[in-house]
């Protein structure tokens, strides 16, 4: 879902997948197969929050969503991520140039829930010891002038100014955000989930927070409970 700036501030893309049909994500909202793998699945058994759906990511699946995006010098990506099982890593690539190799950032959740992030082209250091079966809010803030990014997990900064992965390597340059690409292209077992993807200009200070409808609903419930005690 592409958003206009006036209604939603800095966010220019947001997707909860709640309105998607269960089954293949490919073919819905311009999601595509990537790297000749299989499609991830939309399902409603596991999701972030009490209602809705999420994307099930398993072994030998890779999917891609491209964007027109923006030319802002600072942009962000926000999403909720969870790995439940498997020796295979959940891999998330984000960039603008050549898909995969041209990623500005590559984030993995590996065996046992360990989270890694690329430090330029030099490697993928561990940035947090996560846990299996737990939802995490990932937020990446990209500085396209400095060619670096910061990475936050549940609001805690775990990466400070790591260089872009594709810069000067196989992928060329990353002038903006143009796609998100995720999955695991090998047979090692993986069970993971993605939900509530958001992209936009700036640092995305309110990204990952409940939207206005959620706030309104909670406010109505709150006042209803107060009235009940009167």
Locations of regions flagged by a protein language model:
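Flexible glycan-contacting loops in extracellular carbohydrate-active proteins
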Residues: 161-195
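Extracellular glycan-recognition surfaces and repeat-rich motifs
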Residues: 21-54
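Extracellular, beta-strand-rich glycan-interacting domains
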Residues: 14-18, 188-205
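Short tryptophan-centered beta-strand motifs in secreted/extracellular beta-sheet-rich domains
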Residues: 17, 77-79, 134-143, 149-151
């Amino acid at each position: 879902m592409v958003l206009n700036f006036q209604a939603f501030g800095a966010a220019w893309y947001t997707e909860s997948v709640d309105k998607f049909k269960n089954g293949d994500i490919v073919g819905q909202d311009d999601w595509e197969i990537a790297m000749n793998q299989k499609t991830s699945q939309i399902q409603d058994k596991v999701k972030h929050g009490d209602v809705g759906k999420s994307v099930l990511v398993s072994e030998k699946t890779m999917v891609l969503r491209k964007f027109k995006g923006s030319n802002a010098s600072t942009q962000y990506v926000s999403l909720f991520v969870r790995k439940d099982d498997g020796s295979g890593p959940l891999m998330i690539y984000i960039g603008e140039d050549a898909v995969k190799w041209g990623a500005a950032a590559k984030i993995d959740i590996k065996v046992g829930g360990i989270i890694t992030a690329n430090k330029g082209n030099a490697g993928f250091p561990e940035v947090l010891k996560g846990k299996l079966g737990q939802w995490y809010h990932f937020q990446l803030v990209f500085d396209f002038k400095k060619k670096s990014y910061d990475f936050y997990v549940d609001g805690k900064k775990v990466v400070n100014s790591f260089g872009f992965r594709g810069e000067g390597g196989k992928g060329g340059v990353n002038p903006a955000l143009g796609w998100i690409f995720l999955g695991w292209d090998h047979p090692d077992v993986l069970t993971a989930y993605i939900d509530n993807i958001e992209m936009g200009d700036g640092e995305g200070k309110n990204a990952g927070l409940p939207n206005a409808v959620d706030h309104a609903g909670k406010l109505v419930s709150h006042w209803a409970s107060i009235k009940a005690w009167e």
